[in-house]
């Protein structure tokens, strides 16, 4: 498997926009359809906002991947925030620890082909999503 990668900070609302733009560019370079671009950009936007708002900021690692003929993007969002006490509950639509609609984590999971999450109270959260080219 070969990868191309870039790491970006998420410390402001402007950084969330920069993450969206970087993911869009990576999706275009990977040959994603407009639908696949929209899905991965939307998921990235939700996860970047979560890292900024709930995690106090963090980073995203954007990896363009190739496995044989398959091409995809893997995004890993990491923060050192308060963590998520109940991941199963947090993945349900409507759950929010803030003022949002509570669609971020569950929505990101639905928009991805692969999804993993690790979180520990007082240690932070790491969410990794992968979207493969259709």
What are the roles of these predicted feature ranges?
Residues 1-42:
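Bergerat-fold GHKL ATPase/HATPase_c domain
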Residues 34-60:
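Conserved ATP-binding N-box helix of the HATPase_c
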Residues 54-68, 72:
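G2-box/ATP-lid motif of Bergerat-fold
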Residues 57, 113-121:
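Glycine-rich ATP-binding loops of the HATPase_c
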Residues 61-63, 78, 118, 130:
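Solvent-exposed beta-strand sheet faces enriched in polar/charged residues
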Residues 67-101:
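Glycine-rich/acidic phosphate-handling loop/turn and adjacent ATP-lid/helix
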Residues 83, 121-128, 134:
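Glycine-rich nucleotide-binding loop
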Residues 97-112:
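Glycine-rich phosphate-binding loop
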């Amino acid at each position: 498997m070969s990868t191309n990668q870039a790491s970006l900070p998420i410390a402001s609302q402007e950084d969330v926009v920069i993450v969206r733009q970087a993911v869009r560019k990576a999706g275009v370079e990977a040959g994603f359809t407009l639908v696949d671009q929209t899905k991965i950009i939307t998921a990235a936007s939700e996860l970047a906002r979560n890292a900024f708002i709930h995690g106090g900021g963090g980073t995203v690692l954007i990896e363009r991947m190739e496995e044989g003929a398959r091409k995809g993007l893997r995004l890993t969002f990491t923060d050192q925030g308060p963590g998520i006490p109940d991941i199963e509950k947090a993945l349900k639509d409507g759950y929010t620890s803030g003022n949002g609609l509570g669609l971020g984590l569950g929505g990101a999971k639905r928009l991805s082909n692969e999804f993993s999450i690790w979180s520990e109270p007082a240690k932070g959260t790491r969410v990794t999503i992968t979207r493969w080219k259709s």
